[in-house]
Amino acid sequence: MTKALDGVRILDFTHVQSGPTCTQLLAWFGADVIKVERPGTGDITRGQLQDIPKVDSLYFTMLNHNKRSITLDTKNPKGKEVLTALIRSCDVLVENFGPGVLDRMGFTWDKIQEINPRMIVASIKGFGPGPYEDCKVYENVAQCTGGAASTTGFRDGPPLVTGAQIGDSGTGLHLALGIVTALYQRQHTGRGQRVTAAMQDGVLNLSRVKLRDQQRLAHGPLKEYSQFGEGIPFGDAVPRAGNDSGGGQPGRILKCKGWETDPNAYIYFITQAPVWEKICDVIGETGWKTHPDYATPPARLKHLNDIFARIEQWTMTKTKFEAMDILNSDDIPCGPILSMKELAEDPSLRATGTVVEVDHPTRGKYLSVGNPIKLSDSPTEVKRSPLLGEHTDEVLREVLGFNDHQIAEIHDSGALAPPRKQAAE
């Protein structure tokens, strides 16, 4: 079956997480992604957080499925020739270097356009133009500078970062959408363009409900936040609100049966207005249906702590799955707190390809996330990540059309091997 991005060729200069997230998604949709790596070492994540000595780490394998790997010394004159040929033969160049690195390699935007006017150059940076544009950014820095950390945590505690990689992986997903959009526009214009996604911008985009709340503060307190019911004044910035729902419907994480020994024996419970009477029936507080302190959403706002304390008395008598079954039967919105172990073992996620088992020649079988986006006419087959330089000769021959003699010359030039160290005189 034809894949959605069949015929699109990506020159992948990305490393670590943000860029590889982007290019892996494009590869899952069928693009031919050629990952260019430093001879001898490759992507730094091959050796980071290794659980098995001398094999590619899960950090690398889970971000580089469905790609081809070539090694290339871009400082070598022959290596520059190969890179020029690749730029001429590809549709998109993706990079997440530090500011100015691509220019210092001799491949400015103008130079790339001269080589291939249809080339799309896609970049992930830490910040957009401004006072911080030259700063180095990693996941947690992005969360802190994009508004996520200041609004995550409890009101009386420090800012917290989330376990979800919204800075790295989130920005990679944003960039992938930008690339596909640029490819579509190129069909009409015939021209390439630059696509940039800044990590600060990506985090702020995912934190947009907090920017919403920042503006609401000018008109009064945020009544769905716990501190309103506790009578605590609001300041001039959106506060941290613990596990309060961000969607305007009061919600909290509540203990379930077994919480004393199971750190994930919890459920998220939302007191949605249309099912309030059903909630009252479930927890045995039928009198709350008509009580003036509880009967209407505005009246309940000042009593949320008491309401959730009573609901928690009920949830603590049930496992999180028992509670979920009961609540779902009444359309009461809730969700169990699922551990990574539970997710890895969930047969429904295996069946949909959301969690996949991949076989690797040196590390054996391992689990990975699959494509979270399902296309009916372009199903994803997750293939293992490449070994370092595994496809170098294949790409030189099939993509660039070099013959055996030319490939041998490139090898002899040292363009595909680690730079030789000069012996001390």
From Swiss-Prot:
Homodimer. HAMAP family: Formyl_CoA_transfer (MF_00742). It holds the Pfam family CoA_transf_3. Pathway: Metabolic intermediate degradation; oxalate degradation; CO(2) and formate from oxalate: step 1/2. InterPro entries: CoA-transferase_III_domain (IPR050483), CoA-Trfase_fam_III (IPR003673), CoA-Trfase_III_dom3_sf (IPR044855), CoA-Trfase_III_dom_1_sf (IPR023606), Formyl_CoA_transfer (IPR017659). One of its GO terms (molecular function) is formyl-CoA transferase activity. Involved in the catabolism of oxalate and in the adapatation to low pH via the induction of the oxalate-dependent acid tolerance response (ATR). Catalyzes the transfer of the CoA moiety from formyl-CoA to oxalate. It catalyses: formyl-CoA + oxalate = oxalyl-CoA + formate. This is Formyl-CoA:oxalate CoA-transferase. It is an enzyme of class 2 (transferase). Keywords: Transferase. The active site is at D168 (nucleophile). Belongs to the CoA-transferase III family. Frc subfamily. Its EC number is 2.8.3.16. It comes from the Bacteria. CoA binds at residues 17-18, 38, 72-75, 96-98, 104, 136-139. GO terms for biological process: oxalate catabolic process. The keyword Transferase applies. Substrate binds at G247, G248, Q249. The keyword Oxidoreductase does not apply.
